[in-house]
Amino acid sequence: MVQSLKLKKILVTGSSSRFCKYLKEDLKHYNVFFTSKKNFNILDFKKMEKFLKNKKIDYLIHIAGLSRPMSIHEKNIGLSIDLNIIGTANIVKACNNKNIKIIFFSSNYVYPGKKGNYSET
């Protein structure tokens, strides 16, 4: 399986994230494109879909989003909704349209830091 992935084109969103710093090292022997919001804006659906088509992406690892949405959410709810909800929905829709497999990453920062009625799996 790992050998067959070396033949696939993989796109990773959120390349400036702390997590991607480590992922870049782990995936250096694969055909991976690390994108940033400059060249792959998850809020611009048409450009994003064109990029995916032109690069002929097989897999998309979605990491882009706000790393601490709860603190930013209070200051700018629009930005939080745009990046973490609308942007992710755009990724899912574009990948679905192009038959691209998605791997989605998130962190514990999606929780407000208070004990609540939720669990992690």
Question: Where in this protein do the model-derived segments appear?
Answer:
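Rossmann-fold scaffold of SDR-type NAD(P)-dependent oxidoreductases
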Residues: 13, 58-63, 104-105
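Conserved Rossmann-fold NAD(P)-dependent oxidoreductase catalytic core, especially the SDR/UDP-sugar
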Residues: 90-121
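NAD(P)H-binding glycine-rich loop region in Rossmannoid oxidoreductase-like domains
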Residues: 45-83
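Short, well-ordered alpha-helices that flank and scaffold nucleotide-derived cofactor binding pockets
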Residues: 21, 25-29, 53, 89, ...
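N-terminal Rossmann NAD(P)H-binding glycine-rich loop of SDR-like oxidoreductase domains
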Residues: 2-29
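Adenosine-cofactor binding site in Rossmann-like domains, unifying the SAM/SAH pocket
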Residues: 31-51
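Glycine/Thr-rich phosphate-binding loops of Rossmann-like dinucleotide-binding domains
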Residues: 20, 42, 70-71, 112-113
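Short alpha-helix in the Rossmann-fold core of NAD(P)-dependent oxidoreductases
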Residues: 81-88, 103
